[in-house]
Curated annotation (Swiss-Prot):
Intramembrane region positions: 188-208
Protein name: Protrudin
Chain segments carrying region Sufficient for homooligomerization: 1-92
Localization (cell): Recycling endosome membrane; Endoplasmic reticulum membrane; Cell projection, Growth cone membrane
Name of one Pfam family that matches: FYVE
Any single GO CC term annotated in Swiss-Prot or TrEMBL for this entry: recycling endosome membrane
Annotated organism of origin: Homo sapiens (Human)
ZnF start-end (FYVE-type): 344-410
Species lineage: Eukaryota, Metazoa, Chordata, Craniata, Vertebrata
One annotated GO biological process: protein localization to plasma membrane
Presence of the UniProt keyword Repressor in the record: no
Length: 411
């Protein structure tokens, strides 16, 4: 009987339940609102406008802390220290009230005295959403909107990168990845707590202000510049004498004059080969060959000074010589000249610091005097034109010279 009742009740209940199911079922989910990137950019621009006074104040503080105007920064530092040490509690309350009332008065005057533009004038003067009225009532064109979106994404990416770097640095300090930095950080915190407990608040503020102004790198830069200028004013004669008189060469008779290699002719000023070839060729003979070959190429391109008269007459008398033989004679003559000019320092030591040349300590030849130096002592670059080269490429191409030759050529 029970089963029959259940079977009978099944079809009776189903008609009553089925019509109520659609009424009790939840409505179909509505489509989620689409994300509008341009509205996000407009909100960001409005936020920039609202925070513009704070940004200007931060720029002013950074301008003072970086000592862009040393006198103004010094007066600000001293004035704040005097205020921190002399003002009592009542004076501080007065300063707080003044700091509240002055911005309020300025904002009221700005709002009252500002001219309100109509919509037509605003649309005519519209430009890249700079003011708040432009953002609220003006409409941007498609190129302007795309430019705003791109600028926003670039700024957002830079901000997130800086934030990630800051968080990583904080985690490194907190996790003691660098014990020195972490110990300094926690030591500074403990020192600050002790200072707040032991010293009065006015002295704490004075120390903090002095640290911000006098403890940065820009302050030491300004001090070093003023010290250098003061020394130059106190002894200008010594400075001029140091610049005007180069170090005298070693005079040891005729041999000493030959070794000192005096001022070179324009033909000899066309310097030897490139630095790469000089560094790759370790033995002396390979180094000389690289100098000779590249020197010949530079001479042919630059059309240097003519050969001596005797050589020219000999070439004219031998009219049957071909171009290859003429070139061969020039090669032999310039090779002999370069070998005479090659420095006497063939023992593998740097002329400047006396370091021994090795696989790691490469030999480098000064393109002006020809002496052998290491890469550290011969690291000054000068254009070939300063050495007398007249080719158009000489204005762009540079060669390595030693310190003394660099001072001589740069005058």
């Amino acid at each position: 009987m029970q089963t029959s009742e259940r079977e009978g009740s099944g079809p009776e209940l189903s008609p009553s339940v089925m019509p109520e199911a659609p009424l009790e079922s939840p409505p179909f989910p509505t489509k989620s609102p689409a994300f509008d990137l341009f509205n996000l950019v407009l909100s960001y621009k409005r936020l920039e406008i609202y925070l513009e006074p704070l940004k200007d104040a931060g720029d002013g503080v950074r301008y003072l802390l970086r000592w862009q105007m040393p006198l103004c920064s010094l007066l600000t530092c001293l004035g704040l220290n005097v205020l921190f040490l002399t003002l009592n509690e009542g004076a501080w309350y007065s300063v707080g009230a003044l700091m509240i009332s002055v911005p309020a008065l300025l904002g009221y005057l700005q709002e009252v005295c500002r001219a309100r533009l109509p919509d037509s004038e605003l649309m005519r003067r519209k430009y890249h959403s700079v003011r708040q009225e432009d953002l609220q009532r003006g409409r941007l064109s498609r190129p302007e909107a795309v430019a705003e979106v791109k600028s926003f994404l670039i700024q957002l990416e830079a901000f997130l990168s800086r934030l990630c770097c800051t968080c990583e640095a904080a985690y490194r300090v907190l996790h003691w990845e660098n014990p020195v930095v972490s110990s300094q950080f926690y030591g500074a915190l403990l020192g600050t707590v002790c200072m707040l407990y032991l010293l009065p608040l006015c002295w704490v503020l004075t120390l903090l202000n002095s640290t911000l102004f006098l403890g940065n790198v820009e302050f030491f830069r300004v001090v070093s510049e003023y010290r250098a200028s003061l020394q130059q004013r106190m002894n200008p004669k010594q400075e001029e004498h140091a610049f005007e008189s180069p170090p005298p060469p070693d005079v040891g008779g005729k041999d000493g004059l030959m070794d000192s290699t005096p001022a070179l002719t324009p033909t000899e000023d066309l310097t030897p080969g490139s630095v790469e070839e000089a560094e790759e060729a370790e033995p002396d003979e390979e180094f000389k060959d690289a100098i000779e070959e590249t020197h010949l190429v530079v001479l042919e391109d630059d059309e240097g000074a003519p050969c001596p008269a005797e050589d020219e007459l000999a070439l004219q008398d031998n009219g049957f010589l071909s171009k290859n033989e003429v070139l061969r004679s020039k090669v032999s003559r310039l090779t002999e000249r370069l070998r005479k000019r090659y420095p006497t320092n063939n023992f593998g030591n740097c002329t400047g610091c006396s370091a021994t040349f090795s696989v790691l300590k490469k030999r480098r030849s000064c393109s002006n005097c020809g002496n052998s130096f290491c890469s550290r002592c011969c690291s000054f670059k000068v254009p070939k034109s300063s050495m007398g080269a007249t080719a158009p490429e000489a204005q762009r191409e540079t060669v390595f010279v030693c310190a003394s030759c660099n001072q001589t050529l740069s005058k």
